[in-house]
Design a protein with these regions (language model features):
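The Walker A (P-loop) glycine that initiates the GxxxxGKT/S ATP-binding motif of P-loop NTPases
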Residues: 23
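Walker A/P-loop
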Residues: 30
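Post-Walker A helix-loop "phosphate-sensing" segment adjacent to the P-loop in P-loop NTPases
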Residues: 38-47
Length: 214
């Protein structure tokens, strides 16, 4: 949803500003929306939480363990089920009537049903946190330290002469690259991860940066 800076501010004051954040997991998205919702007049809706609560899990770690890695038995079926759950949870989140909703979407929101993506484009000001080159390696390491549910969408393959772990680390940057264009097509504004993850950047500066330029 394209907005002018004046429209952004007017909607915020009226309580009708709808913002959604998109981007890869482990890039500071959830931390940033939490900071914004704490400092400003936003109601935070976490789609991840809606999903794992629906599955009866009590944490993201439990959800990640359930989904597993793409080389584990039954992953394709769990991936398809996960996308179905994400579609339903995202649709529910976007349909909220709360004041100034700020929706923290899943990293795989781009694979949800078309009607959900249309809701995002039509009804929400979409902020994309782009993973910059300096953070790609960190994302790979962090993914294995704390694996979040991740839809591979056919981008994983077992590489000749590589272990499963080595293969997934090789394929992960390709997955990030394939997703980048899809996130960008949804976005109304893009913020670099170098800004989001810089501890010297105050939340006020991030809030001003995500507003329309004019």
């Amino acid at each position: 949803m394209q907005l002018s800076r004046a429209e952004f501010d007017a909607r915020y004051a009226a309580g009708t500003l709808r913002i959604a954040f998109v981007g890869m997991s482990n890039i500071g998205k959830s931390y940033t929306v939490m900071r914004l919702a704490t400092k400003y007049d936003f109601n935070l809706i976490e789609v991840d939480k809606l999903i794992w609560e629906n599955l009866g899990h009590d944490s993201m770690d439990a959800f990640a363990e359930w989904q597993g890695h793409p080389y584990t038995d039954g992953y394709s079926e769990r991936e398809a089920h996960s996308i179905s759950l994400e579609t339903a949870a995202t649709r529910k989140a976007l349909s909220t009537d709360q004041r100034n909703p700020m929706v923290d979407t899943t990293g795989s929101v781009i694979y949800t049903d078309e009607d959900v993506l249309e809701m995002l484009r039509r009804d929400y000001y979409v902020v994309y946190i782009e993973a910059m080159a300096d953070h790609i390696e960190r994302l790979k390491v962090q993914y294995f330290k704390q694996p979040k549910p991740l839809v591979w969408a056919g981008h994983y393959e077992k590489l000749e002469g590589k272990t499963e772990t080595e293969s997934i680390l090789e394929c992960y940057p390709k997955l990030l690259k394939s997703r980048a264009d899809m996130y960008a097509k949804l976005a109304d504004i893009t913020l670099p991860s170098t800004m989001i993850l810089n501890p010297k950047v105050k939340i006020d500066a991030i809030y001003e940066a995500l507003k329309p330029a004019v």
